[in-house]
From Swiss-Prot:
UniProt-listed Gene3D superfamilies: Winged helix-like DNA-binding domain superfamily/Winged helix DNA-binding domain (1.10.10.10)
PANTHER family in the cross-refs: UPF0502 PROTEIN YCEH (PTHR38768:SF1)
Tree of life domain: Bacteria
UniProt protein name: UPF0502 protein Acid_1185
Pfam families noted in UniProt: DUF480
Regions annotated as coiled coil: none
Family to which the UniProt record says this protein belongs: Belongs to the UPF0502 family.
Amino acid sequence: MDWQLDAAELRVLGALMEKEATTPDYYPMSLNALVNACNQKSNREPVVNFDEETVETALHELRAKGLSSRISGESRVPKHEQRFVEKFNLGRREAAVMCVLMLRGPQTVGELRGRTERIFTFDDLEGVESTLQRLAEIGFVKKLPRQTGYKEQRWAQLLAGDIEVAEEAAPAMMERGASDRDRIAALEEEVAELKRAFEQFRRNFE
């Protein structure tokens, strides 16, 4: 690749890919919706608090790299969509894995299988592994050395450059705590999405 993404560009691109798959009725996305998608608490590691300027700048850079486009249709509000999947001719499996790695950082094969389920359902771990191998062949991901405290090796995306692995221990208790936070954040996000859908429904009848 002759380009590299910064943290904001990576989050924006990942959010666009996720919402295209999970909420197609609200895609392409307005700037405001994209800010909310970047900042949501569920399915995000780390959780961020981007403002509109940060997301707008990231979108500009992504457009310059041919990874997103801006649509000005009948609506007065410009919408944004990702071009990453099309640009690199990725299948649904590859797109799902890349999306989750962009949004949640390095993960094990088992974590990826569970977390990609809303985007693409893998039949088994071998399917995830073979997808990762294909992505590794084109330089998009790599397998990290096993860390102290982890039973399995993790995989990382390389769109934002190579990743340095810290040697600190990662106790199992930390993993369990993260899992609990994931469940709570997911419930909070579901409630927030229901509220947004209701507001959209209400505005349609005003």
